[in-house]
């Protein structure tokens, strides 16, 4: 009982940090559009988005699919999402992804999307296996994670990250669960340079920016995104597209 109460308190604290970060990151609509451009050509049919937040990426790929099952643990964010997306195309569900995913037992998605989610799970193999079970045969996983394991530090720990990924480790994680790698590319190399200077701060990255600075970053994103196309640069994030083998 004591452990369950402790887990509940930790979940409440994590929810608060997560919700606050979502509020700040809402000042970066260009960032969410940038993320969506990295994978939207792979979207089709039924999409399962894990850790959807308030749907700030979802809104960009929604026209390309038939239905989205949008999953989050935070009820306030889900209410915001449900209010934004009417018409029955978005099925908002509350689930703690640290559990058995029983709330998603009926889901067989064509595409599963997990953006900055996998790194929050100590047992990432278990996470990928549960994700795999929610995919239809031949389904696709779209994954975005923090990149460069050498950058892991106090800021990651404060953000609830168990690790950062290198290309080889993310590829191996999915391939040992029966996926093939269609694409795996860095994103936001300029952001990685800035993160390196702040990685030892004991706080969430978004808290190191004032609202005014976030608005400036948002305005600069069309230029920052151009660096993704330059070879040989490591990004702040990795974006992978993995196909489930038949």
Model-assigned labels for residue ranges:
Residues 126-140:
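A short glycine-rich, Lys/Arg-flanked "PGG" loop and its adjoining helix->strand segment in the class I
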Residues 188-203:
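Active-site-adjacent helix/loop segment of glycosyltransferases
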């Amino acid at each position: 009982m004591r452990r369950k109460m402790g887990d509940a308190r930790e979940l409440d604290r994590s929810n608060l940090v997560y919700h606050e970060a979502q509020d700040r990151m809402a000042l970066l609509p260009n960032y969410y559009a940038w993320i969506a451009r990295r994978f939207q050509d792979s979207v089709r049919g039924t999409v399962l988005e894990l850790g959807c937040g308030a749907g700030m990426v979802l809104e960009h790929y929604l026209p390309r699919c038939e239905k989205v099952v949008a999953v989050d643990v935070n009820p306030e964010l889900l209410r915001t999402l449900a209010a934004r997306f009417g018409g029955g195309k978005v099925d908002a569900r509350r689930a703690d992804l640290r559990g058995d995913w029983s709330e998603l037992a009926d889901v067989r998605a064509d595409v599963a999307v997990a953006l900055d989610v996998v790194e929050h799970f100590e047992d990432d193999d278990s996470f990928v296996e549960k994700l795999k079970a929610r995919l239809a045969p031949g389904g696709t996983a779209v994954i975005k994670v923090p990149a460069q394991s050498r950058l892991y530090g106090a800021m990651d720990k404060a953000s609830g990250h168990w690790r950062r990924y290198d290309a080889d480790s993310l590829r191996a994680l999915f391939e040992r669960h029966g996926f093939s790698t269609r694409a795996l590319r860095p994103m936001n190399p300029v952001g990685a340079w800035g993160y390196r200077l702040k990685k030892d701060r004991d706080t969430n990255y978004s808290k190191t920016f004032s609202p005014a600075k976030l608005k400036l970053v948002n305005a600069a994103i069309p230029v920052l995104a151009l660096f993704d196309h330059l070879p040989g640069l490591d990004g702040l994030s990795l974006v992978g597209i993995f196909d489930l083998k038949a």
